[in-house]
Swiss-Prot record:
Top enzyme category: hydrolase
Binding site for substrate: S64, N115, E159, N166, Y190, Y242, V260
GO biological process, one term: glutamate biosynthetic process
Annotated coiled-coil segments of the chain: none
Protein encoded by which gene: glsA
Entry keyword set: Hydrolase
EC number per UniProt: 3.5.1.2
Protein name: Glutaminase
One Pfam family cited in the UniProt record for this chain: Glutaminase
Assembly mode: Homotetramer.
An MF annotation (GO) of this entry: glutaminase activity
Known catalytic reactions: L-glutamine + H2O = L-glutamate + NH4(+)
Family per similarity comment: Belongs to the glutaminase family.
Amino acid sequence: MKPTKQILEDILDEVRPLIGQGKVADYIPALACVPNDKLGIAVFTNDGEMLTAGDATECFSIQSISKALSLTLAMELYQPEELWQRVGKEPSGQAFNSLIQLEMEQGVPRNPFINAGAIVISDMLYSRFSAPKHRLLEFVRKLSGNEHIIYDRVVANSEMDHSDRNASIAYLMRSFGNFDNEVMPVLKNYFHACALSMNCVDLARTFGYLANKGIQPGISEPIVTPMQCKQINALMATCGLYDGAGEFAYRVGMPGKSGVGGGIIAIVPGEMTIAVWSPELDPSGNSLAGTKALELLSERIGRSIF
């Protein structure tokens, strides 16, 4: 079955009672004030159709969803052996901002989707781009077709003001020789990436290339190669939802990437991209109602990579 607007609206009605059972991220003050009752979903198909329901056009902080975009840029800039000697490809099983595993493994992060891995990727982008913030924003605007996407400076500054743990991660990696630049400028770029302000429609369209073998619908040139597309999806399937990746694979069965702003992007290779948003999180830092919505959608339309 193909998704329809009615299916999306029915699913949101079913998951709405979950609101109140999760917790909005409060360790970043600018995120703590987001209303907890927001709920939206968008589906973008490879033939260009967009379906929406709920608060699909309301912007929010995409947070760690941006890590998949930063990885995409890094894969364009670096040879595989350069990239993967600095960050791994394995699930961590630890919290996304853990220091313990990082020290045990000599400053090499388990994967690009935990904080340590994304900070290494930011360091690599900082080495190759003269203006990495501008380059990422330009890239996202191109993919989404929305020239009005911006960084939320309030969120970025809030993260910078509460950056002790991420700074500790960066300095620990630097002590092991896995960091090339000054820490604070790299972190500033990292926090701006997390502070991209987008909505479900923007996100679903932006990640269309991952459902289409690396080619963005509506853009003639490939964004990544088919092999790179497969690799990014594989990493999202195994590592994209922190220490809740296994649970998400079991329930939803799609490659996905979440953020503590309450957004989740999910990919149905060859068919469609789905973006969902609900700010309340489960204990792993993933959207509670958003995960349930994707689970129900997977069941209703009969889609899974497994």
